[in-house]
């Protein structure tokens, strides 16, 4: 759940991602129609999508309709939370994995980026200042990740504008990239999907440089942050206390689900022995442990891999992560949540650099100075 005082009344409101079935009561009357392929065959969704999504075809192309629960926007009305997502214009039922509040247009009102996994579009909701939001992603973003996961915001070039990064699963070397490449040929390929999303969705990280014009430049390749394997959490912070925002990235997965060879073996088993054999096949596989990443911001929109140097390139299946000054010495420490193992707690031993600690206090009801930048 992501918190922000989006209506600027002095108390925290919250946006809750919900990405699982069964549907809520409001979806009980949803109807789906059969979509046929070019030879009259039904269009079959990938197995992971069949539980909670349908597909429709319009004159402008294909569109996915998700049938999971809606996300929730809770407005804090003096200690009582009221769900206002529909009236606020942020009513989505896609497979959300992260939500980030940030004032991207510097108008003083918190805006919201929702990163959605699988085929669901990402959304950049501009806060209109009247309790409602407008999705400006199609005109503000050149493209987004395909399988968006973790995300974070920071001013990576110290120009006073907040930039943003959303993660995906692009392989960090040639072998990983080819082994996880999707099938783009034949009737069961994903090639149809590349034609209809606006903005387009590509399977790699996205780094959005804020131009201050209402549009972003996507510069992941330029920064060196485009491909970090099966990425989950992204956490920006000045880890070396040099005045520039560095970034920690957690990686790994319970199984190597995107390995093309393994997927082909699974499909052959299912065809010959049934779906139970396919599930048993994956149960016998080891988790996909990958190294976590740490990148130092070198300035000029360049980042260098310093994970080994900083002792953060631990090979594990790491999902969530959080930065904070745990020991009160003025630098940022790190906590990482690991699948099937104990969490990692990393103390920052930085002895150089400058620190500044602020204790902000607001006026009136906003005692905690919510919304201060």
State each model region's role:
Residues 1-373:
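Acidic, glycine/proline-rich Ca2+-coordinating loop motifs
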